[in-house]
A protein has these predicted regions:
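A generic structural signal for short hydrophobic patches within well-formed alpha-helices
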Residues: 20, 50-53, 125-126
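Acidic, PIN/NYN-like endoribonuclease modules and their adjacent C-terminal/linker elements
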Residues: 1, 123-151
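PIN/NYN-family metal-dependent endoribonuclease catalytic core
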Residues: 14-15, 28-74, 78-81
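Short His-Asn-centered micro-motif
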Residues: 15-18, 22, 47, 119-122
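Non-catalytic pre-domain segments flanking phosphatase-related domains
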Residues: 1-12
Length: 151
């Protein structure tokens, strides 16, 4: 496995950078999203998404990680992009040229490989996830839109 996680009894949801940015900016959005992660569901963040958040917000990666941990009440699992993950990402970018950037391809590849949901507001990523049968969660200010059932 490219991403070993000790506790497999919990559902894992990959969080896209656009969702993280909105969480950092909107406390009401934070509260709505927090309801999704109820103790049996754990947030997972890819390092590439953290770098995107840093680029957009100007916040240090360590600060973003600390804030996310504070929001969720526990340390958020961060996936480092290793060679095997880069290879999976590359295969998705090759399969869908011009349709997604690096972090989106990584989320898509991990969603396919590990059978995890992706939480995103990015319509392009949602379309690609649908093509690959990866379940998505689109957070809205008043709830969630699920593509597929939450596992």
């Amino acid at each position: 496995e490219p991403v070993p996680i000790k506790d497999t009894s919990c559902k894992r949801i990959l969080i896209d950078s656009c969702v993280i940015i909105e969480m950092l900016q909107d406390p009401e959005f934070q509260n709505n999203l927090f309801k999704l992660f109820d103790g049996t569901t754990k947030p997972v963040v890819v390092d590439k998404c953290l770098f995107e958040v840093q680029k957009v917000t100007g916040w240090k990666v360590s600060t973003v990680k600390d804030v996310l941990s504070r929001i969720f009440g526990h340390k958020v699992h961060i996936i480092r992009t290793t060679k095997p993950i880069e290879q999976m990402e590359y295969s998705m970018r090759f399969k869908y040229p011009g349709e997604s950037h690096s972090a989106d391809s990584t989320l898509l590849a991990l969603g396919v490989r590990l059978d995890w949901q992706v939480c995103t507001k990015d319509g392009g990523l949602i379309r690609l996830c649908k093509k690959e049968n990866v379940k998505t969660i689109h957070p809205k200010s008043n709830g969630f839109i699920f593509q597929g059932e939450l596992k």
